[in-house]
Amino acid sequence: MGGRDLAGLPSRVERFIGGDLGQVEQIFRQELDSQNPYVADIFAHVAHFRGKRLRPMLLLLAASATGPINEAHRVLGAVVEMIHTATLVHDDVLDEAETRRYVATVNARWNNETSVLFGDYLFTHAFHLASSLDTTLACRLIGRATNIVCEGELTQTRERGNLDLSEDAYLRIIDGKTAELCAVSCYLGAHYADADETVAKSLEQYGRTLGIAFQISDDLLDILGSEDQTGKSLGTDFKKQKLTLPLIRLLSQTEEPEAQRLRELLTQADDEAWAEVVRWLHRSDAVEYARNRALEFAAAARSHLECLSNSAAKQMLVEITEFATQRSY
């Protein structure tokens, strides 16, 4: 594994499915084209921070690994990207984030009201586009997945400041808010390639466990990453008192009287407290523990690919599990 060029993986995936990914992008832009100059200006801005396009990539790779890519896949790739982008726009409001992908967030450039409404605009367009397919299956599955994403975000909001949050509860939250959309992307890719239902379900589980590995890694980057590399505001989880896996582990391994001091720091949520918490993290096994858990979920994701025949698409799905836990952005 170690000799692979994982940093160049996104570019290699783009070259492999480039024509189809380009058509996904075209459908995405056509669906969101607006004659309203204000809306068009917001969309042009959002296009700059849409990121890795992981979910449409997963959908297209799942399709390529199980059968030919067709027009339904390209439409669905645009749909899942719209859903994901909507969640980013709304997340930035919840986190009061100021930058994403090196540019100002919608809430920073305009205001929270504009962010909420534009996120809603993306959601409605996603379902409008999904309804253009011949059957209602995709619309129903994506609707269900979006409901689960929202439930995950609502649960995380409810649990802010809960210093007794368990690892199991944390995993349930990220399973909903992050992994669900990866799972449905992979399932739809396989299903619309006429894959056997058993294979489609295996790819769904691949997407789910991969999504969990990605989110744990994201949570580590929020603590240890560099804003120059990630291109987004960091430390937002701490400032919003959202307990993530490294902090859950640190709390579970800290005994009194130190535990009381740690809890005080976690409730202060300012820069000085954050600097001290980071020092605590580095003195503990919390970072290593979280990394190992991410690696475990990545390995579980790879195991769900065993049902696939060898192909370039399968190999890229394997490498994405490695990229998920080794990336710096």
Model regions and ranges:
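All-alpha prenyltransferase/terpene-synthase fold signal
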Residues: 1-329
